[in-house]
Design a protein with these regions (language model features):
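C-terminal/domain-terminus segments
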Residues: 250-278
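Active-site acidic/histidine proton-transfer and metal-coordination neighborhood
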Residues: 16-19, 57-60, 77-167, 176
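A short, acidic, amphipathic alpha-helical segment used as a generic capping/interface helix at domain edges
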Residues: 233-247
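Acidic/histidine-rich catalytic cores of soluble enzymes
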Residues: 6, 68, 125-235, 272, ...
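Hydrophobic faces of well-ordered beta-strands that scaffold small-molecule active sites
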Residues: 4-10, 32-34, 65-70, 104-106, ...
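N-terminal pre-domain/capping segments
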Residues: 1-101, 135, 162, 272-281
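Active-site beta-loop-alpha junctions enriched in small/polar residues
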Residues: 9-13, 35-37, 70-73, 109-111, ...
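Charged helix-capping and loop-helix junction motifs
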Residues: 46-52, 82-90, 116-127, 179-186, ...
């Protein structure tokens, strides 16, 4: 039996939550990552009674929340805007704990290579605050990989002196955006990985990561600069990647994420089978 658990990003089905739970259960998955936390499932729209109902539904289907998404429209690169974003993130961490997970994943913006620049310092300040709060809850605010190579992210995390800000490792983002090796990333980030996405893809043309990760621009670059693909069809070497995760002692979730419009349900089912096949070898 594999030590990994397989889950799915709930928004990828584009269905009501209860139908997503039913589909995940039928696939024999073990968890769901909750998304749409800026609107339908935001802390302000999720009273305690609703949270309990969602948990009851999950548990009755043998599922748990692997994590929730911290869907910020912006990264933490603007000091004036950060105060509100940090408060929003704290409320998401509170909600995560009530939903019986201790992980909120998000993008924080593109970490500059120059650690002495103002943007780097602004992002550090925000992440110091998030790490302190996460530590107080026994939780993690997990940065999703992709906008920078893993060595840059590792140096940034080391500067915080806390595991309160950790890593959600998305191997496809590393491949598609910055051309980084996911296996190397596993070893670089081994002390911080608390959650992972199972996603695959290819880089087509090197692009400006600041544009690629700008909310208003992201969709238009798919197919021009990068392409997301079903698991096993892109440039992520999943056998080696999973072996590396096992080697560092990771035993958490592999959450299938399929963000394209066509064939999502089919690709999620295929992905679950693909992962199981690798994990049984």
């Amino acid at each position: 039996m594999s030590e990994f658990k397989i889950g799915v990003m709930h928004s990828n089905y584009n269905l009501p939550f209860d139908e997503v739970v039913e589909k995940a259960s039928r696939l024999g998955l073990q968890g769901i990552q909750l998304a749409r936390t800026r609107d339908e499932f935001s802390p302000t729209n999720m009273p305690a009674s609703h949270r309990r109902e969602m948990l009851d539904l999950l548990h009755s289907n043998g599922l748990v929340f692997s994590a929730i998404c911290g869907e910020q429209l912006y990264g933490f690169t603007d000091r004036e805007r950060n105060a509100q974003l940090i408060e929003n993130s704290k409320r998401l961490l509170d909600m995560a704990k009530e939903l019986e997970t201790n992980i909120v994943t998000t993008h924080i913006g593109v970490i500059p290579n120059d650690s002495s620049c103002d943007t780097y310092k602004v992002m550090q300040e925000a992440c110091f605050a998030l790490a302190e709060y996460a530590d107080s809850l026994g939780a993690h605010f997990a940065i999703e990989t992709g906008p920078e190579v893993s060595s840059t992210l590792r140096a940034f995390l080391d500067s915080l002196g806390s595991k309160g800000v950790a890593v959600n490792l998305d191997p496809a983002n590393l491949v598609m955006v910055v051309g980084d090796d996911p296996v190397e990333a596993v070893y670089n980030l081994k002390d911080y990985i608390v959650h992972t996405h199972a996603k695959d893809g290819k880089n087509l043309i090197k692009g400006d990561v600041n544009h690629l990760y700008a909310t208003a621009q992201a969709e238009q670059y798919h197919g021009e600069y990068l392409i997301e693909m079903p698991l096993g069809c892109g440039d992520v070497n999943f056998p080696k990647y999973l072996a590396a995760l096992k080697d560092i002692g990771y035993s958490g979730f592999l959450v299938i994420e399929r963000e394209v419009e066509d064939f999502r349900a089919e690709d999620i089912a295929y992905g679950a089978g693909y992962l199981r096949g690798l994990l049984e070898d």
